[in-house]
């Protein structure tokens, strides 16, 4: 409902709509596998960790961790075990429990022992990794701009029919006077960074703190690159390691 294949896997709405209404626009998924940080504020540092966020969010999918684990065990056990090994024992665990649910779900989660919570979280993390594997397959098709640039890089005259005259004027403005390319550069037309562009908040009484609030979230995320459920080696987590450094020289 939020990720329409005809719209680069987003919905085209100002804010996302799930079981409730969100505060930001649904992100397009095509090409997301190349992103360093995920969500508009970068509160996730991998595609698989990002895939988990909406599942437990109260206004998106509104689910909880044990419910997803039970669903996988009931409906996709064979596929799960082919990819990730034996499914842990879930018999006797509450159907609805999780660290981010309502009071009843949180209480049920707290009543589970550490091993049970870790087992469920491992299944949940693997669910995100399976979703991310599919999402990484969604790639942009070569565009007319790609063909234009490839010709110039190869030293060939660009086909005059590839870009219209008004598009060529826009491209010159984008690269030149507009200086859009300062931030929008590279194959994906992004520098993968965060910028304060001076746009006023949608709601002045409740400003969106954006990246300022997200840094603490990604550092404390149990599913981050350095966490126990990550398959990444420490040297593959340079951005997060830099962010978490307490060296004054890096502040």
Segments (PLM) and residue ranges:
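Periplasmic c-type cytochrome electron-transfer domains
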Residues: 1-251
